[in-house]
Swiss-Prot record:
<dbReference type="GO" id="GO:0046496">
    <property type="term" value="P:nicotinamide nucleotide metabolic process"/>
</dbReference>
<dbReference type="GO" id="GO:0010874">
    <property type="term" value="P:regulation of cholesterol efflux"/>
</dbReference>
<feature type="binding site">
    <location>
        <begin position="183"/>
        <end position="189"/>
    </location>
    <ligand>
        <name>(6S)-NADPHX</name>
    </ligand>
</feature>
<dbReference type="GO" id="GO:0042802">
    <property type="term" value="F:identical protein binding"/>
</dbReference>
<keyword id="KW-0496">Mitochondrion</keyword>
<keyword id="KW-0520">NAD</keyword>
<dbReference type="Pfam" id="PF03853">
    <property type="entry name" value="YjeF_N"/>
</dbReference>
<keyword id="KW-0809">Transit peptide</keyword>
<dbReference type="GO" id="GO:0005829">
    <property type="term" value="C:cytosol"/>
</dbReference>
<dbReference type="InterPro" id="IPR032976">
    <property type="entry name" value="YJEFN_prot_NAXE-like"/>
</dbReference>
<protein>
    <recommendedName>
        <fullName>NAD(P)H-hydrate epimerase</fullName>
        <ecNumber>5.1.99.6</ecNumber>
    </recommendedName>
</protein>
<dbReference type="GO" id="GO:0005634">
    <property type="term" value="C:nucleus"/>
</dbReference>
<keyword id="KW-0630">Potassium</keyword>
<keyword id="KW-0521">NADP</keyword>
<comment type="similarity">
    <text>Belongs to the NnrE/AIBP family.</text>
</comment>
<dbReference type="GO" id="GO:0031580">
    <property type="term" value="P:membrane raft distribution"/>
</dbReference>
<feature type="modified residue" description="N6-succinyllysine">
    <location>
        <position position="138"/>
    </location>
</feature>
Length: 282
């Protein structure tokens, strides 16, 4: 145990104590949560019934057109998506509402583009006043991803050598966990080390923010026995599994869909207010 604490570089855990994750606040109309109380919703919130929820095949088709027909690059969309995720997190969990200063966030990144979104998200969270830590166990040997890692390292964002093995340890060290493991293109069984990671996440009491879909969920059917995030950030358009989401905050991010593409797929995206890059659906 002491070796892992030294590895994390975060000092000794205080046994038997559990600080509240969200500081109590006066009744204020803002987008951030009151963890054990009531909340006023932001004026940007609207009913999400009109927004189209995509199947896995539809989501892949939209992505392919963005890359091929509209000539977006992977790193371009990744930057926009990661910024949207950090923005949604800052709206749901403002730094001033958290009990630690700066608020500690664990960002868990998978081996694909969803993990890249997580790396970008972590970088922007650092700029927004949070203290992110990244766990990135399976790193692709590609310039795009190595560049994102370097950017985070240059901003003094630490990378864990191993995942804390118990939910209680994560609860003590971090106030929020960002799930950037698997996106909508994932298929098949969840293998190690991610099976063990998801098992730890299932036992957390701190909130989880999932990027695009909760990792381990079927893209269309969801997974009631899997992790249950408090915040879901749908990118481009929500996926069908989002209809099974029961958390408090559902944001749409990625304000980059060309109007003609939106019309072709009848996405019925909401009108983002002013210059916002995210929109609260729930």
């Amino acid at each position: 145990m002491s070796g892992l604490r030294t590895l994390l570089g975060l000092g000794l855990l205080v046994a038997g104590s559990r600080l509240p994750r969200i500081a109590s606040r006066q009744s204020v109309c803002r987008a951030g949560p009151i963890w054990w109380g009531t909340q006023h919703r932001s004026s940007e919130t609207m009913a999400s019934a009109a927004v189209k929820y995509l199947s896995q095949e539809e989501a892949q088709a939209v992505d392919e057109e963005l890359f091929n027909e509209y000539q977006f690059s992977v790193d371009q969309l990744m930057e926009l998506a990661g910024l949207s995720c950090a923005t949604a997190i800052a709206k749901a969990y403002p730094p001033t509402s958290m009990s630690k200063s700066p608020p500690t966030v664990l960002v868990i990144c998978g081996p694909g583009n969803n993990g890249g979104d997580g790396l970008v998200c972590a970088r922007h969270l650092k700029l927004f006043g949070y203290q992110p830590t990244i766990y990135y166990p399976k790193r692709p040997n590609k310039p795009l991803f190595t560049g994102l890692v370097t950017q985070c390292q240059k901003m003094d964002i630490p990378f864990l050598g191993e995942m804390p093995p118990e939910p209680m340890m994560v609860d003590e060290l971090y106030e929020l966990v960002v799930d950037a493991i698997f996106g909508f293109s994932f298929k098949g069984d969840v293998r190690e080390p991610f099976h063990s990671i998801l098992s730890v996440l299932s036992g957390l009491t701190v909130p989880i923010a999932s990027i695009d879909i909760p990792s381990g969920w079927d893209v269309e059917k969801g997974n009631p026995s899997g992790i249950q995030p408090d915040l879901l950030i749908s990118l481009t358009a929500p996926k069908k599994s989002a209809t099974q989401f029961t958390g408090r905050y559902h944001y749409l991010g990625g304000r980059f869909v060309p109007p003609a593409l939106e019309k072709k797929y009848q996405l019925n995206l909401p009108a983002y207010p002013d210059t916002e890059c995210v929109y609260r659906l729930q």
